[in-house]
A protein has these predicted regions:
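Alpha-helical tetratricopeptide repeat
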Residues: 1-180
Length: 180
């Protein structure tokens, strides 16, 4: 984008990244928001339980997985991170309504902030999309995108065919302008 004024660059950046404020971002693209507040640092023995629960879920041993998640949540009941993980296991078990309840609680506990909160918003947004509840999905993806999630931003673009078409056309034009 050599030869473009700062104003032109700001307009192009806004077109390619519609959730970015007008002008260049203060943060590098790879920046993902993390929470400086207490991020549910789990005791090592609770982390071990969660890891075992995840392995069981991946092996489709759901009964044991959910027993382990319940045990972990008994020891850390306010952990949005554990709720996120259990929601993912519930989705693998095709128990979407229960997963949605865990994600609601994870968002409430985290207030949608920090790594666990953003992950809960993204997971809930994806689940809403799966359930054909696009308005709810969009709300969650907007919140997560504003918090810095590039995944949420990509989902918003994917949900807006007009924006995706415009972005594709602009990329083609700029690639042709920069030459082979």
């Amino acid at each position: 984008m050599e030869g473009l004024s700062e104003g032109d660059k700001a307009v192009l950046n806004t077109i390619f990244d519609p959730l970015q404020p007008l002008g260049l971002s203060d943060f590098p693209k790879e920046f993902e928001t993390t929470d400086d507040l207490e991020e549910n640092y789990l005791e090592p023995h609770v982390l071990d339980i969660v890891k075992k629960a995840i392995i069981c879920a991946e092996e489709k041993n759901f009964d044991e997985s959910f027993q382990l998640f319940d045990k972990a949540l008994t020891q850390a009941p306010e952990s949005p991170s554990i709720l996120n993980d259990r929601a993912q296991a519930l989705r693998l078990a095709n128990r979407d309504e229960e997963a949605l309840k865990d994600l609601h609680k994870a968002v409430d506990l985290s207030k949608g902030k920090g790594r666990a909160g953003i992950q809960a918003l993204c997971q809930r947004g994806a689940l809403y999309r799966w359930m054909k509840q696009d308005d709810e999905a969009k709300e969650d993806f907007i919140r997560a995108a504003r918090a810095g999630s590039s995944f949420a931003k990509s989902q918003l673009v994917a949900m807006n065919p007009y924006a995706a078409m415009c972005n594709a056309m602009l990329r083609e034009i700029t690639s042709k302008a920069s030459g082979p």
